Amino acid sequence: MSRTEPAPAPHEDALQAAARHAPALHSISLRIPATHPPRRGVFISFEGGDGAGKSTQMRMLRDHLVTERSVAEDLILTTREPGGTPLGESIRELLLHGEHVEPRAEALLYAADRAHHIATVVRPHLARGGLVLGDRYLDSSVAYQGAGRELSPEEIAGLSLWAVDGLLPHRTILLDVPTSALDERRGPAGKDRLESAGLEFHEAVREEFLELARADPERYAVIDGTRPREEVHAEVLASVAEVLSLFDPTFEPVPPPRHRDEQ
């Protein structure tokens, strides 16, 4: 049986635009079409440096949807990378708190975590019509492992897109905060391995995030994360309004199929 060719991805134009600024994502997209989630599921990711406020803004968005828009709590999945599954949490501990990991091994560990997380958690929730709010996604790998390490963004983008079978969020919120301000927010105590890297590393990461956003303005919303969190929250709401129109908050998720041995 011949294999059916995938339909052109709705995000194709944005990826073509990325060729001018981020050849990594563009070159890989020629071989792995980036595909959006199913029509009734919505995927929103939050990106930025450590301490930019991603977790806070993700939680505020979730609370707003539940209290102000009456979205059922079980329709909203909040998750994080690395992590999000028992396997992922083990990988997270190794990556963030373990000993030195060689760059290629580090990239492969992040990709393994993401592949398992997307296949077992994110895609099933999207397929049931749910809303996924993610604290970091593959953009973080391109920024941290690509710009800040010894590997190129092209290599990291290719590995990351392969791991998730081309899945991209409907909207990516980039909370941009100057590197020096992030360092002050984190403080000297309790830093993990990545947070303890020098200012030069984190500046390279920030610049790569901004480059990715410039290359893909349809997916990205860049928000000044230095402002009061309520102001940032208001801009987050405005930036996700369009993609949330794809999400029907009255839709009841279809239960996942039962295994034969459960019937």
Where are these regions (language model features)?
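Walker A (P-loop) phosphate-binding loop of P-loop NTPases
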Residues: 51
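Conserved lysine of the Walker
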Residues: 54
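Hydrophobic positions on the alpha1 helix immediately C-terminal to the Walker A/P-loop
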Residues: 57
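ATP-dependent small-molecule kinase phosphotransfer cores
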Residues: 68-164, 235
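A glycine- and Lys/Arg-enriched "phosphate-lid" helix/loop adjacent to the NTP-binding pocket
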Residues: 140-208
